[in-house]
């Protein structure tokens, strides 16, 4: 169900990646495909394009579809932007749609200091995805390397894809 599984028959586990969302013609199609793979606990990455205008609304649509099929567990993950602010807005949107039990996960180079700051700001978060800073102290910096999908092949043509964060949209 993941890209590596589909392309190379290598089973993979983990969270939804921005490259997964970019692989599909639209965010909603990516979310639906992911929900088919992981209907029991579907956690959707909502910040590839725009958290509040498309990510969360599309996640809610997919959760409604899953709910009708008897799957009631899920959540969203926010990986960029003002996570405290976005989590509060997203929580309100999920609650208003009836998904009060769906979780909100924060990630993005988190450490104990950033997590504390998020909590002090009243972020509406249920869990934290801690990656490279889990095993490397801030005093001993880490080289943060991430995979970014730049293009996909569709009908024999290369089609560009881009991931934008909330902060990068300010500068465009």
Language model features with spans:
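C-terminal helical cap(s) of enzyme catalytic domains, especially alpha/beta-barrels
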Residues: 119, 136-157
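Anaerobic metallocofactor- and corrinoid-dependent redox/one-carbon enzyme cores
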Residues: 157-166
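Generic detector of intrinsically disordered, low-complexity, polar/charged segments
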Residues: 11, 126-128, 153
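Conserved small/polar residues in nucleotide/adenosyl-binding loops
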Residues: 170-172
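Glycine-rich phosphate-binding active-site loops on the catalytic face of alpha/beta enzymes
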Residues: 124-142
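Structured core elements
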Residues: 43-45, 75-77, 103-106, 124-129, ...
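Buried, small/hydrophobic-residue-enriched core segments of structured protein domains
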Residues: 1-100, 112-114, 120, 134, ...
